[in-house]
Amino acid sequence: MAREFSLAKTRNIGIMAHVDAGKTTTTERILYYTGKIHKIGETHEGASQMDWMEQEQERGITITSAATTAQWDGHRVNIIDTPGHVDFTIEVQRSLRVLDGAVTVLDSQSGVEPQTETVWRQATEYGVPRIVFANKMDKIGADFLYSVQTLHDRLQANAHPIQLPIGAEDDFRGIIDLIKMKAEIYTNDLGTDILEEDIPEEYLEQAQEYREKLIEAVAETDEDLMMKYLEGEKITNDELIAGIRKATINVEFFPVLCGSAFKNKGVQLMLDAVIAYLPSPLDIPAIKGVNPDTDAEEERPASDEEPFAALAFKIMTDPFVGRLTFFRVYSGVLNSGSYVMNTSKGKRERIGRILQMHANSRQEIETVYSGDIAAAVGLKDTTTGDSLTDEKAKVILESIEVPEPVIQLMVEPKSKADQDKMGVALQKLAEEDPTFRVETNVETGETVIAGMGELHLDVLVDRMKREFKVEANVGAPQVSYRETFRASTQARGFFKRQSGGKGQFGDVWIEFTPNEEGKGFEFENAIVGGVVPREFIPAVEKGLIESMANGVLAGYPMVDVKAKLYDGSYHDVDSSETAFKIAASLALKEAAKSAQPAILEPMMLVTITAPEDNLGDVMGHVTARRGRVDGMEAHGNSQIVRAYVPLAEMFGYATVLRSATQGRGTFMMVFDHYEDVPKSVQEEIIKKNKGE
């Protein structure tokens, strides 16, 4: 099958937002107007097309990023729906990694909310161009210009309206296009009948003012436009559109649009903006990777003529076809039935069938071209972030960073039959979601699952029950603490055993130093002159890694420590890998006496919205929970308090806030960083873990 849409006419976009900003409804409307759905599904009726897992339909939130393909104005638009809830950040990160552009949906009553900040920050890290859609203009309290202001204040974004609303709340009836300087008036409920008229008299002055601001902002990003602007020459609409496109693709400018997806207003204009301002695969830099055979850096430009290279960004288990691997093709062409190399794992994979996904239905295709997104059936060893490439032109593309889990639960199967099924279920769920970890406590035999938050683990336990029919008892959530060293030290680990026959002998000197936050464990071999033979060096590193998994203070995994093996000795006959592993673990224990070991706890960025009258209570809550306030701002009759609070102190806070504010207060929290726990708390944790 020949290529249907050229690369220039392809858009890979994500729709990202805070939970409840109306993202799924917006995606639904896109699918409706692009002819993919015949009836519109509402999230609050639990009938949405993109939310196809049962839990999503019940909770009215989007958990898995379903990839959908649609057509608009002669272009192919691949849409990845991303979740807005903070517990599912990996889903957002995975989708951002394979997108070329994104639409950020705001609730125009609230503007930028905490999760919007998190997703925006991630999109900035990945260099993703964005347009902003201020949604819910029909809602009470909707304020378009306030939303634009929050983009400046909270995100320091160079964002400017390219539209203005006509009316707001119940009176929201149309949109002013600041480029054409025309009014688009909606005359029916489905938003399919649009009248283009002159701008109403009472809005003309405001429209002229904001068009002038728009031209000035765009001119500042382009020298030629700036010269014209300063010399008072007229900038044509075509020049303005080209200027906006260039600045948006360079992530220097963010066009802001408005509408109400629920009331079917503004979605088609937003689709026009996706085509006009967001990049095609040709507009973004060629993806870079490393050749696994030569270690040389290589590029893969977007072209069907280049060798095949793709990134697997999502694994899903489908009840009908089994394991689906979603992938983005960066270069080359892939045919079903062919073989590819998984360069991340060094394994050859056969592509069984290739499917193009539409929310919950699928179309089988023979060939997928560069710049496209599809799902493959039949890949056995591929996991999230793996590179799939031509066998003759191997390359490893930059993978997807996985955040560490911050919360854990104990799960216990209800019966022996459940025990076997639970192992399989947890393994499958962990394959789909890299932020979900499963560990078995060697001493107690308990199974512990860890994830990004309570909702995250709730959903996974729920899926285990529904999809895999496993009945399990679930313990109370526990915080995932970590341990580290705060001072440098040198320590000896000496192990010698003589008990008839072959003895054991291992002797090492290791220097331990604190590592930068987030850098993890780093091992350096600085042995000179073979005082520890080469074949035993890996055993020393392994011995340290195994010991660090259980910490030195309270049994928590150690992070951010450098270990330099610089001296030692061995015995010709008695030295073995086991002896050096034990010696390394003894060195770690010895180091703990002088390296100032510390317990680290996850700190959450908590945003609390409460009525002005309850501000004192809220500040009291933060202080009582060992938190520190980072900032406050007024919004209508409410106050928004931002604070850093330990996760350990946040369990049950929803109930406390509800009763203090008569149900009017809300809060959101997102993991921010790890921090040392105070000495008194550290002593309590150690006591508790030693069962005192």
Curated annotation (Swiss-Prot):
Q: tr-type G domain: from which residue to which, for each copy?
A: 8-282
Q: Where in the cell is it found?
A: Cytoplasm
> Which Pfam families did the record assign?
EFG_C, EFG_III, EFG_IV, GTP_EFTU, GTP_EFTU_D2
Q: Which InterPro entries match?
A: EFG_II, EFG_III, EFG_III/V, EFG_IV, EFG_V, EFG_V-like, EFTu-like_2, G_TR_CS
Q: Name one GO molecular function term.
A: translation elongation factor activity
Instruction: Please provide the Gene Ontology terms (biological process) for this protein.
Output: ribosome disassembly
Q: Where does GTP bind?
A: 17-24, 81-85, 135-138
- List UniProt keywords, sorted A-Z: Cytoplasm, Elongation factor, GTP-binding, Nucleotide-binding, Protein biosynthesis
Any one Gene Ontology cellular component term annotated for this protein: cytoplasm
Its principal location? cytoplasm
Q: Does the keyword Transmembrane apply?
A: no
- Family of this protein: Belongs to the TRAFAC class translation factor GTPase superfamily. Classic translation factor GTPase family. EF-G/EF-2 subfamily.
What function does the entry list? Catalyzes the GTP-dependent ribosomal translocation step during translation elongation. During this step, the ribosome changes from the pre-translocational (PRE) to the post-translocational (POST) state as the newly formed A-site-bound peptidyl-tRNA and P-site-bound deacylated tRNA move to the P and E sites, respectively. Catalyzes the coordinated movement of the two tRNA molecules, the mRNA and conformational changes in the ribosome.
In Swiss-Prot or TrEMBL terms, this protein is called: Elongation factor G
Natural source organism: Streptococcus pyogenes serotype M5 (strain Manfredo)
